[in-house]
């Protein structure tokens, strides 16, 4: 799965790709060709202090 800052091009890679939102993150899933999976956003800073 790729981590991308923008999913605009990722959703147009294949006609079966669809965007879903799970647990506050946006994913592109493609059941017919799983190599097109992608997620938007990076890691959060958890150890602020």
Curated annotation (Swiss-Prot):
Disulphide bonds annotated for this chain are none
Which PROSITE patterns does its entry note? RIBOSOMAL_L36
UniProt keyword Glycoprotein, yes or no: no
Biological processes annotated in GO: translation
Q: Does the keyword Transcription regulation apply?
A: no
Which keywords has UniProt assigned to this entry? Ribonucleoprotein, Ribosomal protein
- A single GO cellular-component term on record: ribonucleoprotein complex
Top-rank lineage group of the source organism: Bacteria
Q: Report the family membership.
A: Belongs to the bacterial ribosomal protein bL36 family.
PANTHER family cross-referenced by the UniProt entry: 50S RIBOSOMAL PROTEIN L36 2, LARGE RIBOSOMAL SUBUNIT PROTEIN BL36B
| Protein's name in the database | Large ribosomal subunit protein bL36
Q: What high-level taxonomic lineage is stated for the organism?
A: Bacteria, Pseudomonadati, Pseudomonadota, Gammaproteobacteria, Pseudomonadales
Gene name on record?
rpmJ
């Amino acid at each position: 799965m790729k981590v991308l800052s923008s999913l605009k091009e990722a959703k147009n890679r294949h006609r079966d790709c669809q965007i879903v939102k799970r647990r506050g993150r946006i994913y592109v899933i493609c059941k017919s060709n799983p190599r097109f999976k992608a997620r938007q956003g990076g890691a959060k800073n958890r150890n602020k202090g």
